[in-house]
Design a protein with these regions (language model features):
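Short, conserved turn/kink motifs that form compact alpha/beta structural patches or helix kinks used as
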Residues: 56-96, 100, 113-116
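A broad, low-specificity signal for short, low-complexity segments enriched in glycine/proline
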Residues: 37-50, 89-98, 120
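Short, charged interaction patches at domain edges and termini
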Residues: 1-21, 64-72, 76-80, 114-146
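Short, compact, well-ordered microdomains
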Residues: 94-128
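Hydrophobic beta-strand residues in large extracellular and virion-surface proteins
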Residues: 15, 19, 36, 57-59, ...
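Small/polar-rich, solvent-exposed N-terminal microdomains that initiate assembly or binding
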Residues: 1-70
């Protein structure tokens, strides 16, 4: 018998896909002078943080823990999952804040809780806003009801 726990490892991909589908169109409407591209602007690749293409929305899946373990322990029934999102721009801090607010609204639509309110940082005309989002995701949960 094959145990299918692959869903746990697909969560980050699904979240990035949802962000591309729902945040990018809103970002394009609100920031006409910036270039937002599906598949490029939102990334989970840490290597993209050096020599950053602006704007960049970096989505990092933090350690998650298994929840709802059964007696046999063969399947993963749920995970407590946390994501850190860094928005990096080269325009101004207020742009980073506004972009993160739009991204946060998509996370809230996916029923995530904001566990670390945005923190802000800047150095040499590069502005960063960071927040963390967490939720319990069960094996048969849908991240987004469309």
């Amino acid at each position: 018998m094959e145990i299918d726990n692959l869903w746990v490892f697909d969560n980050e991909t699904k979240i990035i896909s949802n962000l591309n589908s729902f945040a990018i169109p809103v970002l394009k409407q609100n920031f006409e002078n910036m270039k937002f591209q599906k598949g490029t602007t939102i990334t989970n690749l840490k290597s993209r943080l050096t020599g950053t293409i602006f704007p960049t929305i970096y989505v990092h899946e933090m350690r998650c823990t298994e929840k709802g373990k059964t007696i046999d322990g063969q399947t993963i029934n749920a995970v407590a999952d946390t994501y850190q999102v860094d928005v990096i721009v080269n325009t101004q801090q207020s742009d980073a804040k506004k972009i993160l607010a739009i991204v946060a609204s998509v996370f809230k639509r996916m029923r995530f809780e904001v566990i670390s309110m945005p923190e802000f940082d800047s150095e040499e005309k590069i502005y960063r806003s960071t927040a963390r989002f967490s939720r319990l995701i069960a094996a048969n949960d849908r991240l987004l009801d469309q």
